[in-house]
Amino acid sequence: MLKIGVVGCGAIASLITKALMSDRLNKAEVLAFYDGNLEKAEKLAMETGADFCRSLDELVSKDLDLIVECASVTAVEDTVIKSLNNDKDVIVMSVGAFADKDLFLKLYKLAEKLGRKIYIPSGAIAGIDAVKSGSLGKISEVTLTTTKPVHGLKSALEEQGLNTDDIMDPKVVFEGTVFEAISKFPQNINVSVVLSLASKYPAKVKIIADPNLMVNRHEILVKGSIGTIKTCVENNPCKDNPKTSALAAYSAIQLIKDLSEPVRIGT
């Protein structure tokens, strides 16, 4: 039985927990929760019968195998360091934190030193296996075009001074590097960092706000010595958090199941 603790108790954490609770094979179980908003952690703990922790230190000190970070990019460094130092592997959902190359290298070296693992799910995009394999050759271009409903980008756009009520047709709201994208859309474009890490090449990112779209669309183009990889995924937004896709949570659930299975499919 894989014993799991969860940091961050929002929509993604709830989806992951409920899926594992309903898993008939019962090879993994969430045993403890922590959130900076203690009420959220206490509520989810009461709903599931798991422990409610009042601090991250309390969570990582428990008898757990794996910590799942579902909080925010700002929570990643502390969560990963404390988890690794307490002999626990970590799944990082807020992978946008790794747009900071220095942070990624720091945590990579710590995990290597301690003999622990940091897992990054594929998230809401397809083709990561092929992109990782292709990165063994020479990559010459990586682009990501993400189109989302306006309401899913609303908070990020308004922070940049854009009135979302004025967007009546599909509008390009960002074009630039993966590093710029994650700084302006930290809750919307984690997939760009996953793609860049998998390809070992900095992705060019375009973000489109579409008032008529009901799904989150991610189009990937990768060119290199292996040829061309093109994928397009249209994901249903998470019901409780339209900034992200339900598939992002499902990718973490599948990763957890893979960790407890004797056979693993895919790269």
From Swiss-Prot:
Q: Name one GO molecular function term.
A: oxidoreductase activity, acting on the CH-NH2 group of donors, NAD or NADP as acceptor
Q: Where is the active site?
A: 218
Q: Name one GO biological process term.
A: NAD biosynthetic process
Q: Which residues bind NAD(+)?
A: 124, 190
Task: Tell me which positions the record assigns to the signal sequence.
Answer: none
Q: Name one Pfam family in it.
A: Asp_DH_C
InterPro entries the UniProt entry points to: Asp/hSer_DH_NAD-bd, Asp_DH, Asp_DH_arc, Asp_DH_prok, L-Asp_DH, NAD(P)-bd_dom_sf
Q: According to its UniProt record, which reaction does this protein catalyse? A: L-aspartate + NADP(+) + H2O = oxaloacetate + NH4(+) + NADPH + H(+); L-aspartate + NAD(+) + H2O = oxaloacetate + NH4(+) + NADH + H(+)
**This enzyme's EC code(s):** 1.4.1.21
Quote the pathway field. Cofactor biosynthesis; NAD(+) biosynthesis; iminoaspartate from L-aspartate (dehydrogenase route): step 1/1
The UniProt keywords, alphabetically, are: NAD, NADP, Oxidoreductase, Pyridine nucleotide biosynthesis
Family of the protein in this entry: Belongs to the L-aspartate dehydrogenase family.
> Note on file?
The iminoaspartate product is unstable in aqueous solution and can decompose to oxaloacetate and ammonia.
Q: What does this protein do?
A: Specifically catalyzes the NAD or NADP-dependent dehydrogenation of L-aspartate to iminoaspartate.
What's the protein name? L-aspartate dehydrogenase
